[in-house]
Amino acid sequence: IGSTFHALKQNLFVLLHLVSKYSEFKMMPTVTKNLIIINVLVFFGTLVAQRYGIDLANYLGLHFFLASDFNPAQLITYMFMHGGFSHIFFNMFAVFMFGPILEQTWGPKRFLFYYILCGIGAGLIQEGVQYIQYITELSQHTEVNLIGYGIISMDQYLNMMTTVGASGTVYAILLAFGMLYPNNQLFIFPLPFPIKAKFFVIGYAAIELWAGLANSAGDNVAHFAHLGGMLFGLILILYWRKKSKNNGTYYN
């Protein structure tokens, strides 16, 4: 265990060293930079804890609100947890790409407020979707026959309904960029041509809605949390725009 911990610690310091030396990262606005650092630290903390048999996702991930392991603070902590390297990489890459633009446009306080509130909103929408699933499919049962686990109690099953990740907030960030800079051109792999940001956002939202409604077997992605982040982002941006116009100023 000692050698494993030492290796993880070395990898962590190497990664943070590379990140801190990366010129664009050094020039990044404070809130965006610190959000990425916090997410990376929590991710490596999760890996270290796993080596000691501790599942941080069980404490910091967002449980279904009727589960015994639910804690209201999880509506905040869950957005700093990630389920794997690709999960955190793509989320933080999006924050790295679009976060600085929004922070420079809005200022650090408004950007941080937007980030956290949309993450909470995404979690609330996910909770609502899970509640509908519970009412329509689970509430009449006391046990569940789950593949790979056998027959388990309903409380055990509800505690397994855990959401982690900043994806809801990331989708809100994409929405904000599309609303503030709708005609900016973006190159999206694998498309060989650029598309306007507004079409990019609409396309992503449509894909998430389709995937959420399809509810394919084995799909563990919280699609409605992504849409929830976008919904709360839309409401907040429209509110800010209306408030700015009422104050005699124009808000982009």
Task: Please give the residue ranges for each predicted region.
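A detector for small-residue-rich transmembrane helices and their helix-helix packing motifs
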Residues: G2-N252
